[in-house]
């Protein structure tokens, strides 16, 4: 009995359809790739479900995808005999976008067609790509294991709504009929579709078939023998073997790239990939891709990530995150294991020796891919770093075993060059360390400019000692977990003493000690004047051109960490900076000569707030600072 209902599309679907039709118009043939890919996935899912319920095959275990055209009607039909859908599944999957972060996706759209088409590709348009070429789409489907009277028909013109009806469908699976727009009738041509299938779907592991017309009989002549008539039949247009099961030497670059687009639904080619078959104690095949562009929702906590899992070439699940650490969540690909049970679940994967061993192996494989890229193609590695560098910086906190390898892959700016681009590795830095230098000096600031121009670098610049410049939000978090590299301690130039060690000669040490002794009275006066505003006042070991600076004491939170915690709404323990003065600077020398205690207090406070402004980029009470500045300027004008 017919049960026709009309449903409105979810708002986001309407937006996506409108955007897609306009942004993907120049790449419209991808509709076939997306629909064939979905049909192949439906076959994979049936094959997996049938492992425990063979009756789902309904006597038809030859899984395939069939594509046909009708030039007169102007239609293209994509039909599979896979898992099929129930009425509820149809409404859920063909009327809504069940993705977290959808609102953020729409915010990221810029109006630039080429950029937006990339974003839409990353988002994954799937079934909705039908409307790029069709002004009406009809879907007929029946779920495996359900009766023929439980078929479902879905139909829409891709505007505001769609209808759903109950129909009789004898065969299981899904049939999608595209009623082509007048200007897209070129796609109702077998030859055109064959070329697209060959281009996009050669790697699909089920046969993608088209109808091959029969040929009439040819009678014998003096020139040639008789030829018997042939019947029309469905012919496979693709190799129909799982690409990763083939030898690497038999797979072309183009096939690897198209397979990446199939599993990732990305429109752009991958940056690099690695295809490996491992035999021995463990038996598995991995095909791992590093994309060329970061996904739009990479920082969304709810975003699904992970590898496709196959067991003995049978698809088991998408997004198996157990095989890839979070800091490598951008990696796409699959793993096909011979050692896991076919009925494996996410729960079983969670605490499984085979899973742990596979995760260890593929993690090392990806790090090896990146190390090789960094060594052999620095420019291409910079492309990778620009997209995924901040994610990789999560690694040292997450992966203690591979911390040193991850650290070797990190890139930063440094005082070695004027360029703000992060091109310097820690190995580069170590190779340039001066004789007697035992530490890797670094600074974390709000921006590259703030780091490069920080007064804390003055003495180190004068001595020609390189400093790593860090200015990304994650850097303070990173540095709390990356304390050394290649046996060299990482040391902040804004914390405690500089600890130059052998880089400071005996004459410099003697001069510093003499200056500290001569300045004891001034240091005490400033401390008494500032009181509880600072934890201590001392003569600087790092300034040459600036009158004063503030530094964090050893074991205390840095300015950047305080900012991170405040931004996250966390309580921050109260801390007071150490105030360092440069007695050789004219302003501090003038302060030393000031006999008026009120003026002395004002000057001390002004120098402290200047130092805090330079370090933090802001003040707790900017109005008080401006008032103090104005008072002192007026006093000078009188």
UniProtKB/Swiss-Prot annotation:
Major subcellular site: cytoplasm
CDD domains linked to this entry: HATPase_Hsp90-like
One Pfam family hit: HSP90
Region span, A: 1-346
GO molecular function, one term: ATP binding
Compartments in which it is found: Cytoplasm
Classification lineage: Bacteria, Pseudomonadati, Pseudomonadota, Gammaproteobacteria, Alteromonadales
Protein name: Chaperone protein HtpG
Organism: Shewanella sediminis (strain HAW-EB3)
């Amino acid at each position: 009995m017919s049960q026709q209902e009309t449903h409105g599309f979810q708002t986001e679907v309407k937006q996506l359809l409108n955007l897609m039709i306009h942004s993907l118009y120049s790449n419209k043939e991808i509709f076939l790739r997306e629909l064939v890919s979905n049909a192949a996935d439906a076959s994979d899912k049936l094959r997996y479900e049938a492992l425990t319920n063979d009756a789902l095959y309904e006597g038809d275990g030859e899984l395939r995808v069939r594509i046909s055209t009708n030039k007169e009607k102007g239609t293209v039909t994509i039909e599979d005999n896979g898992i099929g859908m129930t009425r509820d599944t149809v409404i859920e999957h063909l009327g809504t976008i069940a993705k977290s972060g959808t609102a953020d996706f729409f915010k990221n759209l810029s109006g630039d067609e080429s950029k937006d088409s990339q974003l839409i590709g990353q988002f994954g348009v799937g079934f909705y790509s039908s409307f790029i070429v069709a002004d009406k789409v009809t879907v007929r489907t029946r779920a495996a294991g359900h009766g023929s009277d439980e078929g479902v028909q879905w139909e829409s013109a891709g505007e505001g709504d769609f209808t759903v009806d109950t129909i009789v469908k004898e065969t299981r699976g899904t049939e999608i009929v595209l009623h082509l727009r007048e200007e897209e009738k070129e796609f109702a041509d077998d030859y055109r579709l064959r070329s697209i299938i060959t281009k996009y779907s050669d790697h699909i592991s089920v046969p993608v078939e088209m109808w091959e017309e029969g040929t009439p009989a040819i009678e014998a002549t003096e020139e040639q023998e008789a030829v018997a008539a042939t019947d029309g039949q469905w012919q496979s247009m693709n190799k129909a073997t799982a690409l990763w099961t083939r030898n690497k030497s038999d797979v072309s670059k183009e096939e690897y790239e198209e397979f990446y687009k199939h599993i990732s639904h990305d429109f752009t080619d991958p940056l690099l990939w690695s295809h490996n078959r491992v035999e021995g104690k463990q038996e598995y095949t991995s095909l791992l891709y590093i994309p060329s562009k970061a996904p739009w929702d990479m920082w969304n906590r709810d975003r699904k990530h992970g590898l496709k899992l196959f067991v003995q070439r049978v698809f088991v699940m998408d997004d198996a995150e157990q095989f890839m650490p979070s800091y490598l969540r951008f990696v796409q690909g699959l793993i096909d294991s011979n050692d896991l049970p076919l009925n494996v679940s996410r729960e079983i994967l969670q605490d499984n020796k085979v899973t742990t061993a596979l995760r260890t192996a593929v993690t090392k494989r990806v790090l090896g891919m990146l190390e090789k890229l960094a060594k052999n193609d620095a420019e291409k590695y910079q492309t990778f770093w620009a997209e995924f560098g901040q994610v990789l910086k999560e690694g040292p906190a997450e992966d203690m075993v591979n911390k040193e390898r991850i650290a070797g892959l990190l890139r930063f700016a440094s005082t070695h060059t004027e360029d703000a681009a992060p091109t310097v590795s820690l190995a580069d830095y170590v190779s340039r360390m001066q004789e007697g230098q035992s530490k890797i000096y670094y600074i974390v600031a709000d921006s590259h400019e703030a780091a490069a121009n920080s007064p804390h670098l003055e003495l180190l610049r004068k001595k020609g000692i390189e400093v790593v410049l860090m200015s990304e939000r994650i850097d303070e978090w990173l540095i709390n977990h990356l304390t050394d590299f290649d046996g060299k301690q990482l040391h902040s130039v804004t914390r405690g003493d500089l600890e130059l060690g052998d880089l400071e000669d005996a004459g410099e040490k003697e001069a510093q000690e003499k200056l500290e002794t001569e300045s004891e009275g001034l240091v005490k006066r400033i401390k008494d004047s500032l009181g509880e505003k600072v934890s201590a006042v001392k003569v600087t070991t790092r300034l040459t051109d600036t009158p004063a600076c503030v530094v964090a004491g050893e074991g205390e939170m840095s300015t950047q960490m305080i900012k991170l915690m405040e931004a996250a709404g966390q309580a921050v323990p109260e801390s007071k900076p150490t105030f360092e003065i440069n007695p050789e600077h004219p302003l501090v020398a003038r302060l030393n000569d000031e006999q008026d205690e009120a003026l002395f207090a004002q000057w001390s406070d002004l120098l402290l707030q200047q130092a805090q402004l330079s370090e933090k980029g802001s003040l707790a009470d900017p109005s008080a600072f401006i008032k103090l500045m104005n008072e002192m300027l007026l006093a000078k004008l009188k």
